[in-house]
Amino acid sequence: MPTINQLTRIGRKAVFSRTKSPALQACPQKRGVCTRVMTVTPKKPNSALRKVARVRLSSGVEVTAYIPGIGHNLQEHSIVLIRGGRVKDLPGVRYHIIRGAKDTLGVVDRKRGRSKYGAKRPRA
């Protein structure tokens, strides 16, 4: 416990919280190029083939990003936009690719939650 005199001389040290998405460098999104598109299996107790891409960002950092939605058109050298947000059952995947931006197409035939998947409004 510091004395009043010590506090007036030095003051308290601020506690800084570490960011959960350091590769974004405090930006909301970052542009990148896909270097590899692959499927990975989740942690126990889940079972699936989750679609992920290895992305080299404009800052030069290489990260693994999740491709949300059913079906995608991504391949090597595709330009993508990534945002923060981890995938709980995929260790090391801390970023999401934004559907409907750059080379990434929106999800086809998506009726609900369209804004999250870059799908246009279906005209009846």
Curated annotation (Swiss-Prot):
Transmembrane segments: none
Pfam families: Ribosom_S12_S23
Record-given protein name: Small ribosomal subunit protein uS12
Lineage of origin: Bacteria, Pseudomonadati, Spirochaetota, Spirochaetia, Spirochaetales
Keywords assigned by UniProt, alphabetized: Ribonucleoprotein, Ribosomal protein, RNA-binding, rRNA-binding, tRNA-binding
Domain of life: Bacteria
Its job: With S4 and S5 plays an important role in translational accuracy. Interacts with and stabilizes bases of the 16S rRNA that are involved in tRNA selection in the A site and with the mRNA backbone. Located at the interface of the 30S and 50S subunits, it traverses the body of the 30S subunit contacting proteins on the other side and probably holding the rRNA structure together. The combined cluster of proteins S8, S12 and S17 appears to hold together the shoulder and platform of the 30S subunit.
Family: Belongs to the universal ribosomal protein uS12 family.
Keyword hit for RNA-binding: yes
GO terms of biological process kind: translation
Assembly notes: Part of the 30S ribosomal subunit. Contacts proteins S8 and S17. May interact with IF1 in the 30S initiation complex.
Annotated GO MF terms: rRNA binding; structural constituent of ribosome; tRNA binding
Cross-referenced HAMAP family: Ribosomal_uS12_B
Record has Mitochondrion as a keyword: no
Example of a GO cellular component annotation carried by this entry: small ribosomal subunit
Stored InterPro entries: NA-bd_OB-fold, Ribosomal_uS12, Ribosomal_uS12_bac
